[in-house]
Swiss-Prot record:
Record-listed orotate binding positions: F34, F35, T128, R156
InterPro entries: OPRT, Or_phspho_trans_dom, PRibTrfase_dom, PRTase-like
Classification via SUPFAM superfamilies: PRTase-like
Protein's name according to its UniProt entry: Orotate phosphoribosyltransferase
Amino acid sequence: MKAYQREFIEFALEKEVLKFGEFTLKSGRKSPYFFNAGLFNTGRDLARLGRFYAAALADSGIEFDVLFGPAYKGIPIATTTAVALADHHDIDTPYCFNRKEAKNHGEGGNLVGSALEGRIMLVDDVITAGTAIRESMEIIKANGADLAGVLVAIDRQEKGKGELSAIQEVERDFGCAVISIVSLGDLITYLEEKGNATEHLEAVKAYRAEYGI
C-alpha cells in the first residue's frame, strides 16, 4: 500500500466518511464497513480529496484527454481533481460534467465545461451497480469520444448478483480499466498494520470470505 492510500484511509476515518460497525446495504447485505463520500463536504475536504484522486491518476499511468464527472456526485470530484492535477502535477486537464436536465436556453445541451472529446477519464465516488457508468457511456459515445478508464474512491471488491463485482462487470462490458484510490484489500492491510482493531479486522475478513471476488 502506498503512502497516499494510507493517508486517504486515515482522512476518510477522520471525516467519518469511512465507518466500521454493522450497516445494511441497499443489496440487503450486512456490511462491517460503510463509505459515504457525501461527508467530504467542506472546501478543505474537497481540496484534500482532489489530491488523492490526482495521485491515483498519476499512479495509474493511464493516458486521457478530459475528466468527466457524472451528475451529481461526480461533478465536484471532477472539478477538484482537475484543480489538484494542475496544482500538484502540473497537468492542465480539461473537465466536463453533465446536467440531468438538458437546457433549452443559453448555451443549451446537457454538458457543462470542456468539449467531451478524445479519451475520457470518468471520476465518481463508488460503483455499486454500474448504472451511472452505463448512462455516462451513452453520453461519451454520443459525443464521439472513448472511455479511457474509470476512477473511484473505493473498490469494495465484492460480488454483485453473479460471480463478478460491479467493477469487473464495467471492465468487461466497456473494455476499460477501473481504478480506485483504495480497495477492500487496502482496508484490511491498514487494519492489520494498526494492530488495535482486531474486532473490525475479523469482521471485514469474514465479509470478504463470504462476498469477496
